[in-house]
């Protein structure tokens, strides 16, 4: 079974969740909800230092462990862009800003347009690049998601 759709653009425009998440929406750092706020702030900072940002999209209830490609801190505001990931069969990036004090922010999805190029192995044969790429999770993270019941 393929992980990605063949028509990324139309799939992005017609997917129920992606049409909502393509606009800025409220997101929260929801890990360690029962811990004291100071501990949650510190854990949030540690995740950002590791180029990770586990997000919960409040409107849809979707939880995503995002790997960061880029982040910049300006006071309490952390602006970021994620590495590409596959969401509902579509390559996307997560872009937004989170507040390190309130642990809330405004975040949106953007369709990621992968470069397609051909590899020339010899003069006579041209092989297209492989469509599937790793989703950016470690074996331990994949095992944890499987234990939680996600069929991947």
Curated annotation (Swiss-Prot):
The keyword Cytoplasm applies. It comes from the Eukaryota. The keyword Glycosyltransferase does not apply. This is Core-binding factor subunit beta homolog bro-1. Belongs to the CBF-beta family. Keywords: Cytoplasm, Nucleus. GO terms for cellular component: core-binding factor complex; cytoplasm; nucleus. GO terms for molecular function: transcription coactivator activity; transcription corepressor activity. Transcriptional cofactor. Required for controlling cell proliferation in the seam cells, a stem cell-like lineage, acting in concert with Runt-related transcription factor 1 rnt-1, perhaps by repressing expression of cyclin-dependent kinase inhibitor cki-1. Represses expression of rnt-1. Regulates male tail development. May play a role in vulval and/or uterine morphogenesis. Disruption phenotype: RNAi-mediated knockdown increases expression of Runt-related transcription factor rnt-1. Interacts with rnt-1; acts to increase the affinity and specificity of interaction of rnt-1 with DNA. It is found in: Cytoplasm; Nucleus. One of its GO terms (biological process) is positive regulation of locomotion involved in locomotory behavior. PANTHER family: CORE-BINDING FACTOR SUBUNIT BETA (PTHR10276:SF3), CORE-BINDING FACTOR, BETA SUBUNIT (PTHR10276).
